[in-house]
Regions:
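Preference for long, amphipathic alpha-helical scaffolds in soluble/luminal domains
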Residues: 1-269
Length: 269
């Protein structure tokens, strides 16, 4: 799988398309490569990461509407996590990603890209990856401000019991009750649990329903599999085309699910 994700890499570290091209750009390939455990010193991965930083860390004017910066923070979050896992946390451009996330964080703890004038609630989709990125940055550098910001986002997820409206108690999106792989930037309960686990909050009582849901997703053969909407496809052209075939990803999802089960052992309701 790792070889397939690195196939077609150019001498400059790119893959012949924009880094954010879905899903063959370097940005997305790197997220998957890091999830698969590619060694931090891998030269090909680091070269690809430099092309991502050249793009994402370029100066740009913040888009602020009614005092709230509107940002696709999943971009910075994923890039930040990848670079930290590849041993690049001390790169000044990586610090720039942290500064952008800290600056753009909304009062409720998350981020949002929507331009609606009345938008006041963060997007779970845009807030998931920043948790990962900020936690990885803290692990690499000890930066406490990054960890504090990630914890505020974790509280946002927990306040919604991982997938419910804090106002009505209803499920926000039925798709969030499924496991997706790769999930790219999309939120679901499984990746939400992985995020709060990074923060040491997996045993919080507000995550109890999501933990129980994870148990119910275990199949008779002892595996967990992708069951939700498939965000990728194979092909030669167009958006949403992947470099590899993931199938139901049970060999990747199962160990991740088992890690969550072990970490939550003894948690109450």
């Amino acid at each position: 799988m790792i070889a397939g994700l690195l196939q077609g890499q150019h001498a400059d570290g790119s893959f012949g398309v924009h880094p954010y091209s879905k899903w063959k750009g370097a940005h997305w390939r790197l997220v998957s490569l890091v999830e698969l455990g590619i060694p931090r010193a891998n030269r090909a991965a680091r070269a690809a990461a430099r092309t991502v930083l050249d793009w994402i860390a370029a100066s740009s004017e913040p888009r602020v509407i009614r005092g709230l910066e509107r940002r696709h923070a999943s971009m910075e979050g994923n890039a930040l996590a990848v670079c930290c896992r590849l041993g690049m946390a001390r790169d000044r451009r990586v610090r720039h990603l942290v500064d952008v996330l800290l600056r753009a964080q909304w009062p409720d703890g998350g981020w949002n890209c929507r331009s609606d004038l009345d938008a006041r609630h963060s997007s779970f989709h845009e807030s998931l990856a920043p948790i990962w990125g900020l936690v990885e940055y803290h692990r690499a550098t000890g930066d406490r401000e990054a960890l504090a910001a990630a914890r505020r986002t974790g509280e946002l997820l927990l306040e919604h019991r991982m997938f419910r409206s804090s106002r009505t108690g209803k499920v926000i999106d039925p798709e969030w009750l499924h496991i997706h792989w790769p999930h790219y930037w999309h939120y679901d309960f499984f990746h939400g649990l992985r995020a709060v686990a990074m923060l040491g909050l997996l045993k919080d009582s507000r995550a109890a329903e999501a933990r129980e849901l994870l148990h119910t997703k275990r199949r008779p053969d002892g595996t967990w599999r992708a069951s939700g909407r498939r965000y990728w496809r194979r092909g030669n052209a167009g958006t949403g085309v992947e470099a590899v075939t993931w199938g139901d990803a049970h060999k990747i999802i199962t160990p991740a699910a088992e890690t969550l089960i072990r970490a939550s052992a003894g948690a109450g309701t």
